[in-house]
Amino acid sequence: MLFSVSDPFLGMRVTTVLILLCFLASLYAWTANPVTVQNDLVFSLSNLLAGRVWTVVTAIFVHANLLHLVGNMIFLYVFGSTLEGVADSKRMLLAFFLGGIVSFLLSLPFFPSDATFVGASAAIFTLTAVVMLMKPLRFSFLLLMPVGLVAVLYFLYNAAAVYYHLQSDVAYVSHIIGFSLGLPLGIAWSPQWKRNLLVSIGLLAAYFVLLYLITTYVLPLFL
């Protein structure tokens, strides 16, 4: 079987808990006193220097708005459940928190000293890199493509945003850092990581070929 498909709810107990925590933390942050949120929940250089080191963890669960939250939770569901299914919950948690915490810390030099950081995006990027090197052909019905292809496209978009200095509230650099942190984990956990990397690149090539064929030969038939 070329693409592996499994029960989407199999082996995702930790993923479910993380998603619930993100929803609860975000809902609290949206309704709480802004000063409390700024000092006790979001991550920033000032909070770190003030000794509020827990914010490097709490900030992972807090999201800026509903769109930010829902978008991240979709990708957390896809990649978190996949990693739990092919590895185990402990490795999934290790990748998630390592990616989130270290990405926040390493992002500080790239942003103004008064910048604040929230969201699970960087942690999820760590998961995408691990999954890409472990199970790239796992098909996601939610995203309608293999997870290896999603990971590569996800990375390329953010790399392009960094290269072209796209102005946005999104911390693209943090995403790239998170993805980079996931690569050594994927290499360590997957004996076939080289093959899986080539598979992911092959999926990307096939995607662009298909896109070219559709735009060149199919779309003109309807225009």
Regions flagged by a language model, labelled:
Residues 1-223:
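A detector for small-residue-rich transmembrane helices and their helix-helix packing motifs
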